Amino acid sequence: MPEMMRMRRRASSTSVAAFLAILALAGGCGDGPCGNSEDRVVPLSELACNRLSGAGVWESHPLPPMVSEECEWLEFRGCSRYAFENPLGAVPASVVGYLSFDPDGRFSTVGSGNSFIVDEVSDDEVVIRNSQNQLFYLRLVLQ
């Protein structure tokens, strides 16, 4: 009987050790989007297809379908913060981000929750953040 208990303890210890080893490997695998995060300023000159309509609506990128590769949506890395130059010259009443898993904006949706956070809004800049551990592509609309 004591021998049986020792075998169970050894098996249990081995199982725990194997589980901890798997956790350690899983935590160290790959550089997810957070491993490639960035905080940066996005000047208007970097957004080749941005436009300001006569109605005072500014768009960083067009909606799909894309007319050229230079109009692809901005890479919006996980765990990153972006300060956009504000082209309106006034504090926008509305800041809307559209997110897609595709650079051409297909299958996009309105950003919300931790994937699209508005940090600061002023006459000069709009600062947004992606707190998710996920890479998206972004289209920003200010009004």
Feature-to-residue mapping (PLM):
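Bacterial N-terminal signal peptides that target proteins for export
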Residues: P2-F19
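C-terminal motif of bacterial Sec signal peptides marking the signal peptidase cleavage site
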Residues: A24-G28
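Extracellular attachment/recognition segments
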Residues: P33-Q143
